[in-house]
Amino acid sequence: MAEANIRALADIIRRPIITEKATRLLENNQYTFEVDPRASKPEIKAAIEALFQVKVVGLSTQLPPRKARRVGRFAGHRAQVKRAVARLADGDSITLFPEV
């Protein structure tokens, strides 16, 4: 049963976001992830703490508007994405770039 719960939590966190701003936030022990748009803050916090074995002190989320896209004469939208910025407790860290 615990494995099913871990799998459900793993589906909440899609991928880490690596941008200039996200890299700057790493210096303040803040990590940025793309998450499921339907996930709530408690679910996101539980997923990060369970998957990475860290303590999340603060969590903020952003749900930016969808961008319109056009392919030829067909108009559409990009997929809805939600970003979460997690601030970790002092001494905790997540290895996003493993040593080669």
From Swiss-Prot:
Gene3D superfamilies on file: 3.30.70.330
InterPro entries: Nucleotide-bd_a/b_plait_sf, Ribosomal_uL23-like, Ribosomal_uL23/eL15/eS24_sf
Record's function text: One of the early assembly proteins it binds 23S rRNA. One of the proteins that surrounds the polypeptide exit tunnel on the outside of the ribosome. Forms the main docking site for trigger factor binding to the ribosome.
Superkingdom to which the source organism belongs: Bacteria
Pfam families membership: Ribosomal_L23
Annotated family: Belongs to the universal ribosomal protein uL23 family.
Keywords: Ribonucleoprotein, Ribosomal protein, RNA-binding, rRNA-binding
The keyword Iron belongs to this UniProt entry's keyword annotation: no
Assembly and interaction partners: Part of the 50S ribosomal subunit. Contacts protein L29, and trigger factor when it is bound to the ribosome.
GO molecular function, a single term: structural constituent of ribosome
Coiled coil residues, start to end: none
The protein's name in its UniProt record: Large ribosomal subunit protein uL23
GO CC, any one term: ribosome
rRNA-binding in keyword set: yes
Bilayer-crossing regions: none
GO biological process: translation
